[in-house]
Curated annotation (Swiss-Prot):
HAMAP family: MutS2. CDD domains: ABC_MutS2. Pfam families: MSSS (PF20297), MutS_V (PF00488), Smr (PF01713). Its EC number is 3.1.-.-, 3.6.4.-. Keywords: ATP-binding, DNA-binding, Endonuclease, Hydrolase, Nuclease, Nucleotide-binding, RNA-binding, rRNA-binding. It is an enzyme of class 3 (hydrolase). It comes from Pediococcus pentosaceus (strain ATCC 25745 / CCUG 21536 / LMG 10740 / 183-1w). InterPro entries: DNA_mismatch_repair_MutS_C (IPR000432), DNA_mismatch_repair_MutS_core (IPR007696), DNA_mismatch_repair_MutS_sf (IPR036187), MSSS (IPR046893), MutS (IPR045076), MutS2 (IPR005747), P-loop_NTPase (IPR027417), Smr_dom (IPR002625). ATP binds at G334, P335, N336, T337, G338, G339, K340, T341. The gene is mutS2. This is Endonuclease MutS2. Homodimer. Binds to stalled ribosomes, contacting rRNA. It comes from the Bacteria. Gene3D superfamilies: 3.30.1370.110, P-loop containing nucleotide triphosphate hydrolases. GO terms for molecular function: ATP binding; ATP hydrolysis activity; ATP-dependent DNA damage sensor activity; endonuclease activity; mismatched DNA binding; ribosomal large subunit binding; rRNA binding.
C-alpha cells in the first residue's frame, strides 16, 4: 500500500490510538511496522485472530501479557558468549514466565470450551523452558538484583557482610555517644571511600587514631576511620569484593544456561508481542464499538452505519455506504461543508483498517473488499482560492493515479476537476471518471458541478449521492443520501435569511427551466426517500419484535417439551415400580398356593406361569420413547357378576362374585376370595376352554411336564432368554431345587447372556458351570433359593 494514502487518510493516527493499549516493546515494534495487506488470506487470518482477541477480552478481560522489554540485543550478545547483567536476565525470566502463563491461560480456555478460531495455531508455537525459568526465578529479583539463593557461596558471603557491618556500626556508634560527642562535628556514622567513618573536628584528630579518608570543604571536619574498626572494615571490604566476584560468576553461569535457547526466546518474545498487539486491537475495537468486517465474496463494499474513527464517537454521524456490485462509481454532488470529504475518507480509512486486521466502526455484517492499492486526491475542500497552481497540483496527482489503476484499485477524488473554469472542469471530471471505469477500478468522487448529476444517471455502473441539508435549521445533517444527487438550496436559504423576495424572484427567472426542473425532481426524490426510509425503519422494528416474540415462543416450547419429557420419565419410573411390586406380590401368592398341596380340588400351574409372564412383559425401560403401560389408557367399563377379570395388582385372572360397594368387588382367584378395588380390575374375554371351578386345593398338574434340563442350543439370543425366563418360573412352581441350562459353547454370546440374566434374577441362589464330564462351560447348573 502506497505511503501517500496512509498519510492522506491519517492511518498513523489510528495506530497512535492503538498504541495506548500496548504493554510490550515487541508489540509496539509490530504496531510501528503494521501496514494494510492486499493478500486476502493474510487479511482473513488477521481478522480471525482479532476476533479471538475480542472474544477473550469480552470474556476474560484480555490475554495475560505483562509489560515486557525487547531482549533482542541481549540475545544477540549471548550468541557471542557474552555475559548478561542481572536486569537483562530478569527480563528473560519475565518472558519465560509470561510464556507459561499464556499457555496455561489458553489451556483453561479449552477446558472451559471457549471457542478459539485462529490463535490456537499461534499458541502452539510458544515453548516453555521450565528448568531455565525456575533457575532464573530462584536467582534474580525483578529489578535484576541477585538473590541470596542464587548460590550457597553468595549466601555465606552476604551473611558475613551483614555480621561485619553490624559489628562495625556497633563500635562506631560508641563514638557518637557519651564523652566522645564533643570531639565530633556531628554525632553520626557515615561512609567515605566505601568505609565507615565519623566526622571528627580537626583539632581532635588524635583522639581517634586510624585513617583519614576525607575532609570537609571548610577544612574543619575530618572523616576518620577509627583505629579500632580498621581491621573490621578491611574484612568487610574483602567480603564485598568476594561478593562482586561471586555475582559475576553467577551471572556468567546463568548466561551460559540461557544461551542455547536464544532462538526459542526470540520467537517467544515475538509471539508475546503479537498477542499484546491483538489485545490492543481488541481494546480499541471495544472503545470504538467496532465490529468484525466481512470480506465480500462479490467484491462489494457495504458499510452499515459507518463512522469515521478519528471523530468523537458521541458526535460523529454514521452513514450507510455501498459501492461495488451493481455500480463501481459513486458521485457525491452538492455544496461544500456538508461532509462529502469526511464520507470519502471514512470509506478509505475503514478499508485500510480492515486490511490491517482491525475491526471497523460500523454495524455488524458490514462488508469490505481487498484492494491492492488505494489512491486519493484529497485537497482542502474549504479553500476559497482555487488558482492555477492548485489545479496543476491536483492534476499531477490525478495523472499519477490514472497510471496505476487496475481492477483491484480504489480511487478517491475530492472535488474532481476543481480549480479551473467550471465547464472545462466538469468536462475533465467526466472524462477522468470514464477512464477510471475503463480500468475496472472502483471510485468515489465528490463534486459541486451540476453536470455530474446527469453523469450519475446516464452512465451504466454509476450512482449519484448527496449530503442531506436541513433547510429548516440551515445546517447540514451529514447524512449520505444514496441515489439522490445534491440540490442547490441557495434560494431557500437566502429567503430564510431575509433576502428581499423580489431579488429571489428575479434570480429564479435567470435560472433556466431545466435546472429548475432538476432541482424540483431532486426535492421530490428526497421527500420520497425519507418516506421510504421511515417505512423501512418501521418494518425493521416490527421484524425485530417478531423475532423476539419468536425466540420467546421457541424457548417456551422447549421448556414445555423438557417438562413433558421429565413428566413422562417420572411416570415410567412410577409404572415400573408398580410392576415390580406386582411381581413380588405374585411370587408371594405362588408360594402360598404351593402350601395347599394337601387340599382337595385342582389348580393349573400353567395359568400361574402365564400370569407371571404377562407381569414380566409389562416392565418398560425408562429411556423408551413410548411406554406401553402409560400408552394403554384405561377405558370406562361396567362390571357384572360372573365377569372374568384380571386383578392388576397380582396379574391373576379371576371371576367377579358380587359387588361389595361402588368401589369394590369380591373376586374369586383360584381358591382365594378377595375384596378388590374397581381401579385394580380389568375385564377380559372368557377362555374358550371349559372352566373348572377350583375348590379347596391345588393339584400339581404341570410339574410332571417340567424337565430338570433346558436345552437352548440352536436358539436365537432373544428367543433363548424368553424361554429361559418361562422355564425358571415353571421350575420354581414344580418345586425343583436346581436345574441345568444347556446353552452350548459356540461364540459365547448366549452363555454370557444367560449368565447376565441369572445374576440379575433375585430368585436364583447360585449357579456354576457343569462338571467337565457333564458339558463343562457349555451348560450351567442353577440353584434356587
Amino acid at each position: 500500500m502506497n505511503k501517500k494514502i496512509l498519510d492522506v487518510l491519517e492511518y498513523d493516527k489510528i495506530k497512535q490510538s492503538i498504541r495506548q493499549f500496548i504493554a510490550t516493546e515487541n508489540g509496539t515494534k509490530e504496531l510501528r511496522e503494521l501496514v494494510p495487506s492486499s493478500d486476502e488470506t493474510e487479511v482473513r487470518n488477521a481478522l480471525k485472530q482479532t476476533l479471538d482477541a475480542v472474544n477473550i477480552y469480552r470474556l476474560k478481560n484480555g490475554i495475560p501479557v505483562p509489560r515486557l522489554e525487547d531482549v533482542t540485543e541481549a540475545l544477540q550478545r549471548l550468541k557471542i558468549d557474552a555475559a548478561l547483567n542481572g536486569q537483562e536476565l530478569a527480563q528473560i525470566g519475565r518472558i519465560l514466565r509470561a510464556t507459561r502463563t499464556v499457555i496455561n491461560f489458553f489451556d483453561d480456555l479449552e477446558n472451559e470450551e471457549i471457542e478459539i478460531i485462529a490463535l490456537d495455531q499461534v499458541i502452539e508455537q510458544l515453548v516453555t523452558i521450565p528448568e531455565v525459568e525456575e533457575r532464573l526465578s530462584n536467582s534474580i529479583e525483578g529489578n535484576g538484583h541477585l538473590l541470596n539463593s542464587a548460590s550457597s557461596e553468595l549466601r555465606r558471603i552476604r551473611a558475613s557482610i551483614t555480621r561485619i557491618e553490624s559489628d562495625v556500626r556497633s563500635r562506631m556508634e560508641k563514638f557518637t555517644r557519651g564523652n566522645n560527642v564533643k570531639y565530633l562535628s556531628e554525632p553520626i556514622v557515615t561512609i567515605r571511600n566505601e568505609r565507615y567513618v565519623i566526622p571528627a573536628r580537626v583539632e581532635y584528630r588524635s583522639k581517634f587514631g586510624g585513617v583519614v579518608h576525607d575532609q570537609s570543604s571548610s577544612g574543619q571536619t575530618l572523616y576518620v576511620e577509627p583505629e579500632s574498626v580498621v581491621d573490621l572494615n578491611n574484612e568487610l571490604r574483602q567480603n564485598q569484593v568476594a561478593e562482586v566476584h561471586e555475582e559475576q560468576r553467577i551471572l556468567q553461569e546463568l548466561s551460559a544456561l540461557v544461551a542455547p535457547y536464544t532462538d526459542t526466546l526470540k520467537d517467544n518474545s515475538r509471539i508475546l508481542g503479537h498477542l499484546d498487539l491483538l489485545n490492543a486491537k481488541a481494546q480499541y475495537a471495544h472503545q470504538l464499538k467496532a465490529t468484525e468486517p466481512q470480506i465480500s465474496a462479490s467484491n462489494e463494499i457495504n458499510l452499515r452505519e459507518a463512522r469515521h474513527p478519528l471523530i468523537d464517537q458521541k458526535k460523529v454521524v454514521s452513514n450507510d455506504i455501498r459501492l461495488g456490485g451493481e455500480y463501481e462509481t459513486l458521485v457525491i454532488t452538492g455544496p461544500n461543508t456538508g461532509g462529502k470529504t469526511i464520507t470519502l475518507k471514512t470509506v478509505g480509512l475503514l478499508q485500510l483498517m480492515a486490511q490491517s486486521g482491525m475491526f471497523i466502526p460500523a454495524n455488524e455484517n458490514s462488508t469490505v473488499r481487498i484492494f491492492e492499492e488505494i489512491f486519493a486526491d484529497i485537497g482542502d475542500e474549504q479553500s476559497i482560492e482555487q488558482n492555477l497552481s492548485t489545479f496543476s497540483s491536483h492534476m499531477d496527482n490525478t495523472i499519477r493515479i490514472l497510471g496505476n489503476l487496475n481492477e483491484r484499485s480504489l480511487a478517491l477524488f475530492d472535488e474532481l476537476g476543481a480549480g479551473t473554469d467550471p465547464k472545462e472542469g466538469a468536462a475533465l471530471a467526466i472524462a477522468i471518471l470514464d477512464k477510471v471505469r475503463s480500468t475496472g477500478a472502483v471510485s468515489m468522487t465528490t463534486t459541486h458541478y451540476p453536470e455530474l448529476k446527469t453523469y450519475g444517471y446516464e452512465r451504466m455502473g454509476t450512482i449519484n449521492a448527496s449530503m442531506e441539508f436541513d433547510v429548516d435549521t440551515l445546517q447540514p445533517t451529514y447524512k449520505l443520501l444514496l441515489g439522490i444527487p445534491g440540490q442547490s438550496n441557495a434560494f431557500e436559504i437566502s429567503k430564510r435569511l431575509g433576502l428581499d423576495s423580489d431579488i429571489i424572484s428575479q434570480a429564479r427567472g435567470l435560472v433556466d427551466q431545466d435546472s429548475q426542473d432538476l432541482n424540483n425532481m431532486i426535492k421530490d426524490l428526497t421527500t420520497r426517500q425519507k418516506r421510504a426510509q421511515k417505512i423501512n425503519q418501521q418494518a425493521v422494528e416490527l421484524l425485530k419484535q417478531a423475532e423476539e416474540y419468536h425466540q420467546t415462543l421457541v424457548k417456551g416450547v422447549d421448556s414445555l417439551n423438557s417438562q413433558r419429557s421429565n413428566l413422562i420419565e417420572s411416570a415410567k419410573e412410577d409404572a415400573n415400580r408398580i410392576v415390580n411390586d406386582s411381581q413380588a406380590e405374585a411370587d408371594r401368592i405362588i408360594k402360598r398356593l404351593r402350601k395347599l398341596e394337601h387340599s382337595t380340588g385342582s389348580f393349573k400351574e400353567n395359568d400361574l406361569i402365564d400370569a407371571k409372564s404377562k407381569i414380566n412383559a409389562l416392565h418398560q425401560d425408562t429411556n423408551l420413547k413410548r411406554n406401553k403401560v402409560l400408552r394403554r389408557a384405561k377405558e370406562a367399563q361396567k362390571f357384572h357378576e360372573n365377569d372374568e377379570v384380571v386383578v392388576l395388582t397380582y396379574g391373576q385372572r379371576g371371576e367377579l362374585l358380587r359387588q361389595v360397594d361402588k368401589k369394590h368387588w369380591e373376586v374369586q382367584m383360584g381358591i382365594m376370595k378377595m375384596k378388590v378395588a374397581v381401579d385394580e380390575l380389568e375385564k377380559v374375554k372368557p377362555d374358550k376352554t371349559v372352566k373348572r371351578r377350583v375348590h379347596n386345593s391345588v393339584q400339581r398338574t404341570a410339574s410332571a411336564g417340567v424337565k430338570t434340563t433346558l436345552d437352548l442350543r440352536g436358539k436365537r439370543y432373544e428367543e433363548a432368554l424368553t424361554e429361559t425366563d418361562r422355564y425358571i418360573d415353571a421350575a420354581l412352581l414344580a418345586g425343583y431345587d436346581e436345574v441345568t441350562i444347556v446353552h452350548g459353547k459356540g461364540t459365547g454370546a448366549l452363555r454370557s447372556g444367560i449368565t447376565k440374566y441369572l445374576k440379575n434374577n433375585r430368585r436364583i441362589k447360585a449357579f456354576e458351570y457343569a462338571p467337565a464330564n457333564a458339558g463343562g462351560n457349555g451348560a450351567t447348573i442353577v440353584h434356587f433359593k
